[in-house]
Design a protein with these regions (language model features):
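Extracellular ectodomain segments of secreted/surface proteins
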Residues: 1-13
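Aromatic-rich carbohydrate-binding modules that target alpha-glucans
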Residues: 12-59, 69-96
Length: 96
């Protein structure tokens, strides 16, 4: 699930990425244009959900995917849109 919150003080949009319990055994990273496809780790919470929040420039569109346990790619069901990537799969889109 994606949640967005405009931070007018810092002129950014804070985007929270959430995945449900059972998504991964070891790790989840959100990998996208906003982190040069390097990956930002999601933290496993006490309730088993995975979460991280990143600050993004407003008025932009970013492609991303989730990398689960270092080997499995997932798209975001609540993404703003999807675009086909060079590997024939969909990347998720978040618009700020």
């Amino acid at each position: 699930m994606l949640r967005k919150r405009r931070d007018t003080k810092d002129n950014v949009v804070k985007v929270t990425f959430d995945l449900p319990p059972g998504t991964a055994h070891e790790s989840v990273r959100v990998v996208g244009e906003f982190n040069r496809w390097e990956g930002t780790p999601l933290e496993r919470r006490k309730d088993g959900t995975w979460r991280t929040t990143v600050s993004l420039e407003p008025g932009r569109e970013y492609q991303f995917r989730y990398l689960v346990d270092g080997e499995r790619w997932l798209t975001e069901p609540s993404a703003d849109d999807y675009v086909r990537n060079p590997y024939g799969e969909d990347n998720s889109i978040v618009r700020t």
